[in-house]
Amino acid sequence: MGIRNFEKIRIKLASPEKILEWSHGEVTKPETINYRTLNPERDGLFCEIIFGPTKDWECSCGKYKRMRYKGLVCEKCGVEVTRAKVRRERMGHITLASPVSHIWYSKGSPNKMSLIIGISSKELESVLYFARYIVTSSQESTVEVGKILTEKEYKLLKQLYGNKFEAYMGADGILKLLTAIDLEKLRDELENELAEANSAQKRKKLVKRLKIVRDFIASGNRPEWMILTNVPVIPAELRPMVQLDGGRFATSDLNDLYRRVINRNNRLKKLLEIRAPEIVVKNEKRMLQEAVDALIDNGRRGKPVVAQNNRELKSLSDMLKGKQGRFRQNLLGKRVDYSARSVIVVGPSLKMNQCGIPKKMALELYKPFIMRELVRRELANNIKMAKKLVEESDDKVWAVIEDVIADHPVLLNRAPTLHRLSIQAFQPVLIEGKAIRLHPLVCSAFNADFDGDQMAVHLTLSPESMMEAKLLMFAPNNIISPSSGEPIAVPSQDMVMGCFYMTKERPGEKGEGKLFSNIEQVITAYQNDKVGTHALIKVRMNGELIETTPGRVLFNEILPEIDRNYHKTYGKKEIKSLIKSLYEAHGFTETAELINRVKNFGYHYGTFAGVSVGIEDLEVPPKKKSLLNQADKEVAQIDKDYKSGKIINEERYRKTIEVWSRTTEAVTDAMMKNLDEFNPVYMMATSGARGNVSQMRQLAGMRGNMADTQGRTIEVPIKANFREGLTVLEFFMSSHGARKGLADTALRTADSGYLTRRLVDISHEVIVNEEDCHTHEGIEVEALVGANGKIIEKLSERINGRVLAEDLVHKGKKIAKRNTMIHKDLLDKIEELGIKKVKIRSPLTCALEKGVCQKCYGMDLSNYNEILLGEAVGVVAAQSIGEPGTQLTMRTFHTGGVAGAATVVNSKKAENDGEVSFRDIKTIEINGEDVVVSQGGKIIIADNEHEVDSGSVIRVTEGQKVKEGDVLVTFDPYHIPIISSHDGKVQYRHFTPKNIRDEKYDVHEYLVVRSVDSVDSEPRVHILDKKNEKLATYNIPYGAYMMVRDGAKVKKGDIIAKIIKLGEGTKDITGGLPRVQELFEARNPKGKATLAEIDGRIEILTTKKKQMRVVNVRSLENPEEFKEYLIPMGERLVVTDGLKIKAGDKITEGAISPYDVLNIKGLVAAEQFILESVQQVYRDQGVTVNDKHIEIIVKQMFRKVRIIDSGASLFLEDEVIEKRVVDLENKKLEEQGKALIKYEPVIQGITKAAVNTGSFISAASFQETTKVLSNAAIEGKVDYLEGLKENVILGKKIPAGTGFNKYKSIKVRYNTDDKPEEE
């Protein structure tokens, strides 16, 4: 069995015997090497007797040289004759004069050592560092074992009891206690105590202790092994000492740390020999303890040990930790040979599967292959001569090199490698020069451009790797992105420009209206300049006359016949969908050739079109002036309304901004209409070749609203554009936004990279493991609708390529069977029948213990076939979510901080057809319109509820039939008014509004704020009649603006107060990426909403508790049952008294927490909530990520459960364990007829889930390395190497793709008929 051939790996504590077993000798001297002879000192840290010879097959004194003395130990110098490489594997040890504790276990929380002994970690520390005594044995009942004594107490007790008890300081005492522990007995005691314990605090403590005791028993570790009596010394070559140019030495920090341990240990030995006074010995023992602490984990306790230049020394723990540690630096990312790197330039003449490699580079990369070929062709007599020929780049070499590289693909990689398309394989083509040539169509996959980007080339060496490169990684196989199923190798820029220009039509061109009998005639006429490129002509094709243009005829010539369309103008979008449909029909190879033809066509005619940009092309629309004047008038009117007290400041601000947003749009429209269809800038933007309308608006329209430093929109817009030029003030206002964009980019890129890393860490073990898990579960999917009723993701997009979880039935007719994959035809059918909900299989409900099955995953998005077994879908999911993260971060960059207009919503529309019914709506008539005066009423159509705020105008009548999209109510977009339904006099109760004066306009506003007199009761307004009788009472929330004064008269329909609606700020991905992180980390959002836990009716009580409002939700079925919520006075309620409400609905304003959704609505709802919230962020940014990728991550977040009742199992309550482990245990318990385990699902954020993953190697390489390893060692954890990371770290083939475990057992059989001929 080879060293590589193992299935699992285990980590345990090392016993003192084990350390000696590893060792090849004791290091007793702190010396390293002799400064004169430069030979290692005997018994020192580099001793050749212990660690092996420094030169191959040669002993230290030189008596025995050469290989024939292999294995001999020289009698003169005692060194074994062997390879020098053993200095990398032979260990030594230091025998300590006094035991010391291992800092990983004596410090940190939970503190293992103190838990096992049953003292606090503070007490443990005081004993270990010689401040207190601990009693280790006692015959006296008053002095119990484990008691902590100060110096005074110890002396007093010694006088009293003499030798009836023993107490020690330092690790000696702890060692004695730990050795004496009987783990089984301790476990039974703790279990009994736990059964009797009644306080939660005590139970928690006992559970912690019991867990550690059980871990020790299960793993076969002994507690006293946490105390070191021998310290292992790692092999000499792993802590090297090298001579620098100036004769000085550079050495690893570890050598310094070891030297301190050895020095102190030797000094302690001497002190003990000469029987030094107690106090000196104790001090030396403490220093030894500190030296060993520093060696294991420097800086963990006390001041870190520093070198001369005040730099902290790197200890053994630091060698493992962090990005520079062993795991991430050397095991997960290695530097590789057979690689090269250079600048890239465009190679438009290459085929899709080719790349240009400079001759010099190829010569070096393929060196051994060229040498072999030279010898094989007898152009060189031996390898040595061949090497010389290659190095002199002899003419013979050029003859060979073409053949050598002919079938030998290379891999190209561009950093940052964000997804799997950042590494692709190409067939090399030799070129002159020193730059690598890249095919223009793969640029978007690599995210490369030619402004100085560099790329790395790697050579495939083994036949297997060459095979995989050709079959899986060739560029033509990567036309489609695995994250969304959309084409990614799409022509861009010049190529689009050429195709767009050629397929446009222009009335009145030369030869318009001519008739042609066939395509050849058109082309001849065009080449002879008898007809213009864009002229509308008629051509006979397949027996019918088709109206088209010569340009379109030429473009369609390069397409297969079935895909031709002579009426279309091809911009980037059209070309993209063309590529998609081509791929669906013809597969990769043909599509690749076709895209190449489109590329050549585009470049050729793009050059021929001669599109260029001059400043005259940016025409400022003549209408701009009048539009701006109109806007200025509107703003003046708004200011007037504000001064007269009709509106409040916030409304004035928002209305002003809305006017300017609208004007900016109008100017943009005017600009676009004003431009000629063939204006170069217009063509570039509309075709998708370069730039967009928002950039054009800034160049030739107006810049519009800008955001200030706080992210609020400035109410004075920038009226100028870049062609007219900005004034100094305008420039100053806009510079902040532009710079913020750049700063954001820099900060966010790092964030996004870290997000990707966490996602990979949590999902790398998800592999397609089986064909079918035979579950009947699934998730119900419908179109994803945003807050403003806009469809974010269509149903067809969500279910494309998924598998049905149950038969699809519509009106009693079966349309498709269960387990059918949904493809294009079925999608069309579903849309045609108007089906709104479909139940599909999903990774979330997959029943496999590990990984997912083919059916639950569905289609492989990168090739539209069923996903293959062994596919690493987890990593693909992580990359698909992480890669756009980096793009999202760079969104603000090009538009230069222009504030995005939040669209103003001022009406509610019906979401479906049906009959209207009202619930809890009170209206009064004002100016002939029905105005709502109640809060929280609803309009119900079929089973869809539409909430109606007060102040809304109702546009439908009860019982009216409406169609989807009909307007139900209109309302003011900026505020919710509180309207008087009576004539009368106003009386304020329990509040005095704060008077706010606006200096600029000299206007007073009255804001309702919390004051001393309103502590106990809510602010209200009574409307009184002439006899001062109450006609009506209105609750006024804090933050409302009073529109009438105390004692004023009001008429029916007057506005008493206004509540500001929360506005959307500028939407920047700043909202985006942090939001995605918040969701995946399952953090409680800031200002979270209170949700109702049961269905019922709202009761808002007038009494207060703890100065908070009381809101009850009383169940409708059982009026006895209700839930009480205490709402702080400042929070805004979104419910009213008597409103019917469902479990999970909001009671107060705010963001929803996933934990609340889980507790109230259960697991499925919580999973869907995270999935849909993430999807919303990505869709807002215009990024398509398929649901299934997010589902895989969410599945990993929910893989753990919390034990509520452990039944007959050995689990402890409140323990968080993988669901699959608990389910297995329950299966066993069920078979034995014992009590089952009860549990509840828990959400773990991605960081936590990655640290708590089943594999300790993967977890240690992620974060908190020392903690993970120390815990795993105590548990004696076994890593079954199921994920990808563990296998990469151990240098094994990953268990995915061609390394998938099921493929290992495949036997190759020949069919009897076609056996290969015997030679």
Swiss-Prot record:
Q: Tell me which domain of life the UniProt entry assigns to the organism this sequence originates from.
A: Bacteria
User: What GO biological process, any one, is recorded here?
Assistant: DNA-templated transcription
Q: Which residues bind Zn(2+) 2?
A: 773, 846, 853, 856
Q: Which GO terms describe its molecular function?
A: DNA binding; DNA-directed RNA polymerase activity; magnesium ion binding; zinc ion binding
Gene Ontology cellular component annotations, sorted alphabetically: DNA-directed RNA polymerase complex
Q: Which residues bind Mg(2+)?
A: 449, 451, 453
List residues binding Zn(2+) 1.
59, 61, 74, 77
Q: Which reaction does it catalyse?
A: RNA(n) + a ribonucleoside 5'-triphosphate = RNA(n+1) + diphosphate
What subunit structure does UniProt give? The RNAP catalytic core consists of 2 alpha, 1 beta, 1 beta' and 1 omega subunit. When a sigma factor is associated with the core the holoenzyme is formed, which can initiate transcription.
Q: Which family does it belong to?
A: Belongs to the RNA polymerase beta' chain family.
Q: What is this protein called?
A: DNA-directed RNA polymerase subunit beta'
Q: What organism does the record attribute this protein to?
A: Fusobacterium nucleatum subsp. nucleatum (strain ATCC 25586 / DSM 15643 / BCRC 10681 / CIP 101130 / JCM 8532 / KCTC 2640 / LMG 13131 / VPI 4355)
